[in-house]
């Protein structure tokens, strides 16, 4: 009897508690739903680099109790390329893995992303990419679905938080079935809005199992040619799975003057105008790609014209223009029915449907524009003030910046920087400008961005003895995305020395008002130096320092 009681406490009670927990509905952000879905899907590791709007997926997993109990890998990677490569390594060993990034991060990971479709997977691999239409915190609003189409892998695009959870949970099984990585593509609004989500059973993790084909992950040309043919032959399976997917469906309407293709969250926007859940027009809901040709053909046969609702670029709209042979008119972003750029929203969809749309009110002139600004007390402020004074004797346009909080140095009162293009471009653009004769040229880069993509540019500059000064503004965290730990923490000087920078021209200083004159002197000396120099203004992010002090109380 005592043995039964012990077994009951150790086995039955935890199982029942977990069952009750998973039956409950949870109010999740889209990013949280994906994190929970990945955990419940038997994931063994998540590999990511912070980037809005994807950051909170990994943060949710880092703080999750089940992830802690299972010891799921959940540390940040140096960049998106290393993240996805490491996730593929876990897949190689038979475990399920997820890699998360924002849309421009996929540019960084493009090499491994495309080639992973060729190698295929062993354990399930889900690549979650968060797009940012309207560029709320990004350089562009590129549509990651094109990458999925280019790599010829299945793409999942949820229309709701519940689908985001389900796709994250079941995406590993789809990856193992198709033997390729699966992309899970979301956008900002779905990532950062809440809805009720019903959890399902928590699946066990995979056992460590080596690939059955010892050459599966060796892309020598002779093997790669065979693998590529196999990927092409798999397209019919991917199409079949898409046509049979629970996420794609045909909703019959009574008014055939218009047919609608609604992709991902655009389906949600469409149905907001039909509270009863019945749209008078026939609708093809698309949340899994490749496009379900059976439903698309039926819509073409039954409807006079087609309206395509999709968040991002007109990818499906362009495909349909070449898909239909009978000249069915297609409306969407390309013909002006919908705006060519920016986010979709329910009001824009209403206008496309011929419904009344509330235009809103003009902002009164008395309301002052309030652009983002560096935090009061931020170390970047002191660095820019000193840099501006040291550069006063030179012409403008010499400071090449990077991606981070310090990009706000483009705005008043500093107006220091002249570029912000992509991660790591500060050093390489400064080198190119110096090669063209713009001397001195200055690169402004953060500590985490330096680790992400700046080291190779520094190596180029050292190899050619370029006349550039690199300012690595070190706030000891990835502050712009929430204060995550930087991969370069405590290592910047060692990295610079290891790459070949002369230690005599590596300087570290605390960016404070009391050190202003010393900073100006350092900048002036190194701007005049004919070679590579590095100045590291180091002070903890003011927001992170405040948070740390609050947590101590």
Q: Model regions: which residues?
A:
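Short helix-loop-beta junction
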Residues: 62-67, 271-283, 494-502
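Thiamine diphosphate
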Residues: 14, 19-161, 189, 253, 410-534, 542-550, ...
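Short secondary-structure boundary/capping segments
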Residues: 142-146, 198-203, 276-277, 322-325, ...
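Short beta-strand segments
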Residues: 100-101, 126-130, 183-187, 261-262, ...
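Flexible, low-complexity linker and terminal segments
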Residues: 10, 14, 19-31, 41, ...
């Amino acid at each position: 009897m005592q043995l039964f009681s012990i077994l009951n406490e150790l086995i039955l009670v935890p199982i029942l508690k977990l069952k009750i927990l998973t039956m409950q509905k949870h109010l999740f952000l889209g990013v949280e739903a994906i994190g929970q879905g990945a955990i419940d899907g038997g994931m063994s590791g998540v590999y990511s680099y912070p980037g809005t709007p994807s950051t909170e997926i990994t943060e949710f997993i880092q703080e999750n109790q089940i992830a802690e109990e299972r010891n799921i890998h959940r540390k940040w990677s140096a960049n998106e390329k290393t993240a996805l490569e490491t996730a593929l390594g876990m897949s190689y060993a038979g475990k399920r893995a997820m890699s998360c990034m924002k849309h421009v991060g996929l540019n960084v990971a493009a090499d491994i992303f495309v080639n992973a479709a060729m190698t295929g997977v062993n354990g399930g691999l889900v690549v979650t990419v968060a797009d940012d239409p309207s560029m709320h915190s990004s350089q562009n609003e590129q549509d990651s679905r094109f990458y999925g189409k280019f790599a010829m892998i299945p793409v999942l695009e949820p229309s709701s938080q519940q689908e985001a959870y389900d796709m994250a949970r079941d995406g590993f099984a789809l990856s193992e079935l198709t033997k390729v990585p699966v992309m899970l593509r979301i956008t900002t609004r779905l990532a950062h809005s809440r809805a009720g989500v019903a959890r399902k059973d928590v699946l066990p993790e995979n056992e460590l199992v080596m690939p059955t084909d010892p050459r599966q992950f060796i892309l020598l040309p002779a093997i790669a040619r065979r693998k590529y043919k196999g990927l092409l032959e798999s397209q019919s399976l991917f199409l079949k799975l898409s046509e049979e997917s629970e996420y794609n469906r045909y909703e019959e309407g009574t008014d055939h003057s218009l047919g609608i293709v609604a992709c991902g969250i655009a389906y949600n926007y469409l149905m907001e105008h039909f509270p009863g859940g019945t749209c008078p027009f026939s609708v093809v809901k698309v949340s899994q790609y490749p496009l379900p040709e059976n439903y698309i053909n039926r819509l073409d046969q039954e409807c006079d014209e087609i309206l395509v609702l999709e968040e991002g670029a007109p990818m499906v709209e362009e495909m349909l223009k070449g898909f239909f042979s009978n000249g069915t008119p297609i409306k969407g972003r390309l013909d002006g029915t919908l705006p060519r750029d920016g986010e979709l929203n329910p009001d824009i969809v209403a206008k496309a449907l011929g419904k009344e749309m509330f235009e809103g009110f003009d902002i009164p002139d008395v309301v002052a524009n309030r652009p983002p600004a560096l935090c009061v007390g931020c170390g970047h402020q002191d660095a820019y003030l000193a840099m501006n004074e040291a550069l006063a004797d030179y012409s403008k346009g010499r400071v090449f910046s990077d991606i981070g909080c310090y990009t706000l140095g483009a705005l008043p009162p500093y107006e220091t920087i002249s570029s912000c293009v992509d991660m790591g471009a500060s050093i390489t653009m400064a080198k190119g400008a110096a090669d063209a004769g713009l001397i001195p040229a200055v690169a402004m880069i953060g500590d985490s961005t330096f680790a992400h993509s700046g080291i190779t540019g520094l190596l180029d500059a050292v190899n050619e003895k370029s006349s550039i000064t690199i300012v690595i503004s070190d706030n000891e965290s990835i502050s712009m995305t929430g204060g995550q730990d930087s991969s370069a923490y405590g290592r910047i000087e060692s990295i610079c020395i290891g790459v070949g920078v002369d230690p005599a021209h590596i300087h570290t200083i605390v960016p404070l008002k009391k050190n202003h004159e010393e900073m100006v002197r350092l900048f002036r000396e190194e701007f005049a130096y004919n070679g590579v120099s590095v100045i590291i203004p180091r002070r903890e992010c003011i927001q992170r320092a405040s948070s740390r002090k609050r947590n101590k109380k």
